[in-house]
């Protein structure tokens, strides 16, 4: 559960309504794979991830980034039940994929940076603070199965 004020909820919803999930998802996942190269081991089937340009131009990275942000959008619609919303994904990432739950926090922080880059002055300190709460809540929900 994420505790947001009505103003924070409105700010998150307003900005998220402008997000191009296809582009931002691919950029966020791509940046995660470039900045934290050890995360690439979970995506060996994606083909060439040998250079930043290869990662950022990889269609499988873009497609999976879109999928990730689609799930994130579902979370935004269920901020009062993030653990329930992400229960199956938490189980998948824990039991089958064996993803270090710290990677969820890293991706959330990368997403915040990508939003800041894409929205500039619209991404005010107040909007940033609200999104930090949201990505922290999503990361906690995704890590729930690990506990």
Swiss-Prot record:
Residues 3-147 form the Globin domain. GO terms for cellular component: blood microparticle; haptoglobin-hemoglobin complex; hemoglobin complex. InterPro entries: Globin, Globin-like_sf, Globin/Proto, Hemoglobin_b, Hemoglobin_oxygen_transport. One of its GO terms (biological process) is hydrogen peroxide catabolic process. Belongs to the globin family. The keyword Acyltransferase does not apply. Heterotetramer of two delta chains and two alpha chains. Heme b binds at residues 64, 93. It comes from the Eukaryota. This is Hemoglobin subunit delta. One of its GO terms (molecular function) is peroxidase activity. Keywords: Heme, Iron, Metal-binding, Oxygen transport, Transport. Red blood cells. It holds the Pfam family Globin. The gene is HBD.
């Amino acid at each position: 559960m994420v505790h947001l004020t009505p103003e924070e909820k409105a700010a998150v919803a307003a900005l998220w309504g402008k997000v191009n999930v296809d582009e931002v998802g691919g950029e966020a996942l791509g940046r995660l794979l470039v900045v934290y190269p050890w995360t690439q081991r979970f995506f060996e089937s994606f083909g060439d991830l040998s250079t930043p340009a290869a990662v950022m131009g990889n269609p499988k990275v873009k497609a999976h980034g879109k999928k990730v942000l689609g799930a994130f959008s579902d979370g935004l619609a269920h901020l009062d039940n993030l653990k329930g919303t992400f229960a199956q994904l938490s189980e998948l990432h824990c039991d089958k994929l064996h993803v270090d739950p710290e990677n969820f926090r890293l991706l959330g922080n990368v997403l915040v940076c990508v939003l800041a880059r894409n929205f500039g002055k619209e991404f005010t300190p107040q909007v940033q603070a609200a999104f930090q709460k949201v990505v922290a809540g999503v990361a906690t929900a995704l890590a729930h199965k690990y506990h």
